[in-house]
């Protein structure tokens, strides 16, 4: 009997223990709003008691676009089983290959790390039709589940589906869909818990569609949760992938050996200057001409110390690699200041003790050869990860490290000097193997493409480190020859006019590429700086500056509303090479004006090296007041170089420019398609213009736009049925512009250009940017239009005239746009308005040959997602054709415009005002890209004809 009682007691105890270990099951029926009491809810989230599934019970939880619903189960990451039904509607964004996510569902840890499935989009996923599992932190801006994911390959079948996340305390996480393991009959063929960072479950996660199209609504029904005990199983991640860096490079290089110029072999310093030039640099540094740079440098070096956190990454890697490290090193060269020498050595030892130059932050190591050797072995053994040691931060760090090692070469301890030389060489190898040869998983956006700032930036550090640390030895030949091939590829696809399709803000990347070219020319005898691009880049920089040189004539991704000059001091060197005294004077003037600005005050080492004080006598006021940039289809005019001058820019060209686009047919993909070209920073702005006067922007443009994306509604152009310009196969409004699948060179094209002294006429055709398109988000659609011809006429001291000829085969709504910081009506009946900013203002008048419905709205223009709140005239017409004529009055001449049509293909435009009675007779172009015929006249003034014969635009 005692044995029986003892047995019963033992069984009872076991049952109690088992019951306590087993979770209490919780069910949520979503019958009323109290069902989510205690949840963390944001955005479009609601309980719908009437929404259910066939054979289901209770209502459903609705999570609309942007909504979030988190149910925190506790503070610990435990085992447990989570089951629910979701309704899959199959909807997807227009561009499912852009990194984004639609509706998501899953589980999360106590520290906010979520594991989710649902509609996950990326170039390497099929998120529009299949599922993946992704991990991210929903609270961390920029983090996305596509960045760490496992592909399930399961179809997104429309309908209700049961999802189970079973976190077993002994075995880890299993995922089931409709009660079937996502791994099917082959374990771990798709999902492997050990590849995740999810040790247990604390929270249940439901998130709404976050794509631009925001078309998906998530419905959740029948939620059941059973929390279990603490996890016994621990994540056992697979071993890291093997390092991508081979022990040795290939023995033989393709092509001729890279030989160092005799005067440079085994000589230091040799990067950017030699020992023979140091006396000249010192003289300039101590001269009145060098005073600003000297004061900048002396004021800056005090803060040049190794950071306490030992991170290389502040300011995108620029703070140390491009600013502080080279600044203090050059200060030592020029002054022999012992403190600056010690700071420079400390920088080198910091980097010698750091394997990861992308982030840094590694603990300090002993100052011994053995410790540095271990760091070197760590570097060589690093496996693929993101863009570690192959991103811009790593490259910028290589720039500063290479220059400092080279400039201080003769004063460094010989043993440490050799250790650091090896570090530079190995970092160059890692940059090339990890970046250019795809050893790291990320970086596809810049690999293989020409004319892109990210590639130029990487080539900067790669070249200085490889050529600076190398000597042309047999074992170095392969990498040196690869570097030369890389530079040649960049050289081959530079536009001749010195322009950059990414906008004037990216002049720093051209300066970086120029330094790489210059080092190659100096050390190995190439002639890359002989490229027409570098003959013209200084002029381009000046011409894309506003007349006061405190800001740029903005296009593409430029800082909206901010002041700044888009010049790299390296262009002083190229201007000196080509004896461009006026350009040099302009750059010098701008660097003085912006002396205290970020990116200038911290770059004083550059103008000290690159200026040539022997070139004198120039004046920027002698620079041309009208210029045409054929690669981008840009016309720039100004009435002088005075600060309050009137200036205008007209743009009609393909995204990426003609030169980069000409590369695509030469590198077709296996199936015959055109390859990817990075146009991420280009804007949909064909046939747009800006106007400045009285030292202010009057007709404004977009900034460095992010949300709500790159839109034609942010610039001075037109919309068709409310939709702007798109590339073939791409949606409107991407944050990072993507190339069309077909030829982009006909999206925008200059059809005529004529400079006639005080009169400049430029004409562009942009119908190719208004292809047939349906927007998944707004449900708007439009047919392709036949013509969007805009003529932009500059009459110096008088007015600016814009004339549009717009045609479609089907009736459409045409919306004509013009925006400024402030816009107010003067006489709406006459179409007269006033643009204003600060103390500057000018009036304009708009006429058309069809009835207009005009209103003043707010532009979508933004700068880093902050709306600029430009006020925008939106003048709409309906039909198959419309002609608009707009006269802008920046010289305050009180001019007026009249438009008199003569059938569909002819019109007369008159511009009148005190002392002005001009007539412009227009006859439409015959062919797609033929020039229209214009005859303009002013009594006792000009009498000009512009047509296909007299106004052929300069070739790109």
PLM features: residue spans?
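Secretory/extracellular carbohydrate-interaction modules
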Residues: 63-133
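Short, aromatic/His-centered strand-loop micro-motif at the edge of beta-sheets
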Residues: 137-162
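Extended polysaccharide-engagement surfaces of secreted carbohydrate-active enzymes
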Residues: 506-956
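Extracellular carbohydrate-recognition regions
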Residues: 23-44, 83, 232-239
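Flexible glycan-contacting loops in extracellular carbohydrate-active proteins
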Residues: 186-219
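Short tryptophan-centered beta-strand motifs in secreted/extracellular beta-sheet-rich domains
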Residues: 159-168, 173-177
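Aromatic-lined, polymer-binding surfaces characteristic
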Residues: 270-278, 282-539, 546
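Extracellular glycan-recognition surfaces and repeat-rich motifs
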Residues: 34-60, 67
